[in-house]
């Protein structure tokens, strides 16, 4: 195995692989064409800072390894599982395909799940609760799995995440288990925009987190917004940190102290004046 290949396998995780894959398989067909392979490998190597002068040589080596060790269909289609098995560790491979079975749309949905299982706000869920969590997750997606499959999923998750064997999983563990789309807030650059652009962006942001369409953020909607805000500056956050920041946000923005953040209250917090 060449150095570039070893480097990517050592550092590539399921989320990163999926982000790159989606650029080429926008329709989620589960395969890319052989003609797209060079560009896919280019993106993969660029992610890990492989020098341009070495790019062509490494891409060629990777293609040769793929052709030798994996099946390519007569139509020139390369399945995602072929490339994933080539670049991801066993654990990350498992996570990738589990996530495809149980996708989530946004951080609000994620936080609804987290709050249900971290009912005491300890910042952890017990490994014993993991089995119930996984069963509910499949039911949420209208998928029924056998007890044997559930036991296998639970056992693998514990092996991957409960490394210190304390029987607990934290917020970051759950975030890795679940397939969250890229942080919604990353697409906005509030500081670099005109007032009108900021207002327009604010409308999109509020609409995204106001899942219940009540005109106010409450419960997991506030949690989801807080989680995405924090992850802009701190990629790895704990449940305890999230609760602290949530409390600070409510203290500053919840003017009428009803436990919710009205649209006008959030706008005021962000220094915006919007039409009522």
Swiss-Prot record:
GO terms for molecular function: calcium ion binding. Ca(2+) 2 binds at residues 162, 164, 166, 168, 173. The keyword Glycoprotein does not apply. It comes from the Eukaryota. The keyword Amino-acid biosynthesis does not apply. Keywords: Calcium, Cytoplasm, Cytoplasmic vesicle, Membrane, Metal-binding, Repeat, Secreted. It is a peripheral membrane protein. Its main location: cytoplasm. Highly expressed in pancreas, in particular in pancreatic islets and pancreatic beta-cells. Detected in prostate, adrenal gland, small intestine, stomach and thyroid (at protein level). Induction: Down-regulated in cultured insuloma cells after dexamethasone treatment. Ca(2+) 3 binds at residues 210, 212, 214, 221. It is found in: Cytoplasm; Secreted; Cytoplasmic vesicle, Secretory vesicle membrane. Ca(2+) 4 binds at residues 254, 256, 258, 260, 265. Ca(2+) 1 binds at residues 118, 120, 122, 129. GO terms for cellular component: cytosol; dendrite; extracellular region; nucleus; synapse; terminal bouton; transport vesicle membrane. Residues 12-47, 105-140, 149-184, 197-232, 240-276 form the EF-hand domain. This is Secretagogin. The lineage of its organism: Eukaryota, Metazoa, Chordata, Craniata, Vertebrata. The gene is Scgn.
């Amino acid at each position: 195995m060449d150095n570039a290949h070893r480097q990517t396998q050592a550092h590539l995780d399921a989320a990163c692989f999926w982000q790159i894959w989606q650029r080429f398989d926008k329709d989620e067909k589960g395969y890319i064409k052989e003609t797209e392979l060079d560009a896919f490998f280019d993106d993969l190597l660029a992610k890990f800072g492989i020098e341009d002068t070495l790019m062509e040589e490494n891409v060629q080596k990777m293609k040769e390894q793929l052709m030798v060790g994996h099946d390519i269909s007569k139509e020139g289609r390369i399945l995602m599982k072929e490339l994933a098995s080539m670049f991801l560790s066993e654990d990350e491979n498992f996570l990738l395909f589990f996530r495809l079975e149980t996708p989530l749309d946004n951080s609000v949905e994620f936080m609804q799940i987290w709050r249900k299982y971290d009912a005491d706000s300890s910042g952890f869920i017990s490994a014993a609760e993991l089995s119930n969590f996984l069963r509910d997750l499949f039911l949420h997606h209208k998928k029924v799995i056998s007890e044997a499959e559930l036991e296998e999923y639970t056992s693998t998750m514990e092996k991957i995440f409960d490394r210190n064997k304390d029987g607990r999983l934290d917020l970051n563990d759950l975030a890795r288990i679940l397939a969250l789309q890229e942080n919604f807030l990353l697409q906005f650059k509030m500081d670099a925009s005109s007032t009108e652009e900021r207002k327009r962006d604010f409308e999109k942001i509020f609409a995204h987190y106001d899942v219940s369409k009540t005109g106010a953020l409450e419960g997991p909607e506030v949690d989801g917004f807080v989680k995405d805000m924090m992850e802009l500056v701190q990629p790895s956050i704990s449940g305890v940190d999230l609760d602290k920041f949530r409390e600070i946000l409510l203290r500053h923005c919840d003017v009428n102290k009803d436990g919710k953040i009205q649209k006008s209250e959030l706008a005021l917090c962000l220094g915006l004046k919007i039409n009522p």
